[in-house]
């Protein structure tokens, strides 16, 4: 499956889409998953996301594997054949779009996982739910999206998911290895606002200002 995984990753890298705008990305994923045996595919979920369920041949828990599928408004400065060719409107401006956070890899990795596990369905214990989440970078202003909207639309229900593993690459992990732990594993960011009431001062006495 490695050649396919590389090809998928390069495809997504070349044609990235911003949060809640992953129309072609979601369709590409869903169309592929529908070709696999033993998978129940739901699309669209949370506008552009995809959910696929694999019921294993042995008893066990219901777990979910999740990958994010959106890109960022970033210009790619790398001369590679599959560099991003996409520009779009973002906050009223024309911007370039790039998979600068690895979501192209995460998506390809989860597609490859779905292919392998669906082929060995009889040996899989429990049920696997594959979650391809849009808008991980944050839904546009005044729009719903991301994990909250997927949950709201029942992505973790029917079957009821007992645990979720987020798929993420790491340049510090040797090829052929995986890392996992209970609870949080990698950092994320929170948004907050600081209001500062300034006080002017002379340039020769900056310590007097705020």
Model-derived regions: residue spans:
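Acidic/His- and Gly-rich active-site-bordering loop/insert found
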Residues: 1-99, 108-125
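Histidine/acidic-residue-rich, glycine-tolerant segments that coordinate divalent metal ions
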Residues: 86-98, 104-105, 122-210
């Amino acid at each position: 499956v490695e050649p396919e995984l590389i090809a998928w990753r390069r495809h997504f890298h070349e044609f990235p889409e911003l949060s809640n705008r992953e129309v072609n990305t979601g369709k590409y994923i869903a169309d592929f998953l529908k070709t696999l045996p033993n998978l129940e595919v739901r699309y669209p979920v949370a506008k552009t996301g995809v959910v696929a369920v694999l019921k294993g041949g042995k008893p066990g828990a219901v777990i979910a594997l999740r990958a994010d599928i959106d890109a960022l408004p970033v210009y790619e400065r790398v001369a590679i054949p599959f560099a991003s060719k996409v520009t779009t409107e973002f906050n009223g401006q024309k911007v370039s779009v790039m998979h600068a956070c690895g979501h192209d890899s995460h998506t390809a990795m989860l597609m490859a996982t779905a292919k392998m596990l669906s082929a060995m369905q009889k040996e899989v214990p429990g049920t696997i739910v594959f979650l391809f989440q849009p808008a991980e970078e944050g839904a546009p202003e005044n729009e719903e999206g991301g994990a909250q909207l997927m949950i709201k639309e029942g992505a973790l229900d029917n079957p009821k998911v007992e645990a979720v593993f987020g798929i993420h690459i790491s340049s510090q992990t040797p090829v052929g290895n995986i890392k996992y732990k209970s609870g949080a594993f990698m950092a994320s960011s929170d948004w907050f606002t600081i209001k500062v009431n300034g006080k002017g001062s002379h340039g020769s006495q900056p310590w007097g200002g705020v």
